[in-house]
Amino acid sequence: MTDTALTGQVHSLETFGLVDGPGVRCVVFLQGCKMRCRYCHNPETWSQQGGETWTAEDLFRKVYRYRNYWGKDGGLTVSGGEPLLQMEFVTEFFNLAKKKQVNTALDTSGNSFCLDPSYLERFDRLMDLTDLFLLDIKAVDASLHKQLTGQDNAGILALAHYLADHG
């Protein structure tokens, strides 16, 4: 690994996932999430510390070995934690996947989304490499959302509107 290689904090891999997108998928669970959902399936991913540090290239090389299981409908899903907290890493990982014609899916709460122009530029780059976007909206009602997650949902709803407007 070079000093300039982009790295990410990876909690774990599920090499034969059947619920995080269509077909058989290799699911990468990233470390770090600001929400504290009462019914979280992965609370061990909340801390930004922990997991293993990977370069996007090394991680892709590892998961690409499972491609024969994916068939024409499967591929890679990045989840978390909150993958948008490591957007540059996910973008590089998906860029490597697209070079090999691998289907990509992003499973996110959208909690870190904002309408800042520099953020949107980075987000749009990621979207260009994402085949399936899974937005996990916990609750539309702001007070219920805060009660369930400990966070407001303004950024999440802004993301839903942004996706609807920008297809």
Give a label for each model feature:
Residues 49-56, 149-153:
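Flexible, glycine- and charge-enriched loops at secondary-structure boundaries
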